[in-house]
């Protein structure tokens, strides 16, 4: 007879095996959540000023990803965090979702796109909820969110699509294999936040005043 903990592990293992065989369900679910979040935001009555801000920041974030040619050394996560911190979770989340969707027109669309949309959208939303004010707090937030959160979810996606088994050991193997890329991404995010936080926030504060946008 199984103990409570062993029964839980037994059920988790069998659920994991089922999920590994039906990972497309998870991909569709994440895509649905990401698109639903976008639709829910746009369903409300938007002012022209809000559309201008979202479009402008999304264009900057997409350009930051496309025009920097060093693999994984991209400023877009930093731009998303700054957007959320300046304008709140709704704008930060939308900029993140659109960054993943639009930039992959250049990099290629695939089953990874909804995962990236979800990661960047939630990072922008959390940055907005935290209302980051200090540069150091933004740098630390960006470093760990890029390394642990974004990297963890994308490594999980890699395991779903490229792994032969589905368990914690397989996941750790993908984490170890991807640690170099994740460190480049997290260090780039921290560096661009350190260099761009103050000048970027000053310009966004003027934009908020100009368009009369309040958090």
Go through each PLM region and give its residues:
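Hydrophobic transmembrane alpha-helices
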Residues: 2-81
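Generic transmembrane alpha-helix motif of multi-pass integral membrane proteins
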Residues: 35-39, 76-92, 125-130
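Membrane-helix interface segments
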Residues: 47-50, 89-94, 133-138
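Interfacial aromatic-anchored transmembrane helix boundaries in multi-pass membrane proteins
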Residues: 62-77, 97-131
């Amino acid at each position: 007879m199984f103990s409570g903990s062993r029964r839980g592990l037994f059920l988790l293992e069998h659920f994991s095996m089922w999920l590994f065989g039906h990972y497309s369900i998870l991909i569709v679910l994440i895509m649905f959540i990401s698109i639903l979040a976008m639709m829910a935001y746009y369903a409300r009555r938007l002012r022209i000023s809000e559309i201008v801000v979202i479009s402008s920041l999304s264009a900057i974030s997409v350009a930051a990803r496309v025009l920097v040619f060093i693999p994984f050394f991209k400023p877009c996560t930093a731009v998303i965090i700054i957007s959320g911190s300046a304008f709140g979770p709704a704008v930060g989340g939308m900029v993140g979702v659109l960054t993943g969707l639009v930039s992959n027109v250049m990099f290629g669309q695939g089953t990874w796109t909804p995962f990236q949309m979800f990661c960047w959208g939630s990072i922008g939303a959390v940055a907005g909820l935290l209302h980051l004010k200090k540069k150091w707090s933004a740098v630390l937030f960006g470093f760990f969110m890029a390394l642990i959160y974004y990297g963890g979810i994308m490594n999980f996606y890699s395991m779903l699509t490229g792994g032969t088994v589905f368990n914690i050991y397989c996941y750790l193997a993908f984490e170890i294999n991807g640690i170099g890329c994740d460190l480049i991404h997290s260090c780039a995010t921290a560096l661009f936040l350190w260099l761009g936080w103050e000048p970027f926030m000053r310009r966004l504060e003027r934009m908020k005043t100009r368009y009369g946008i309040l958090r």
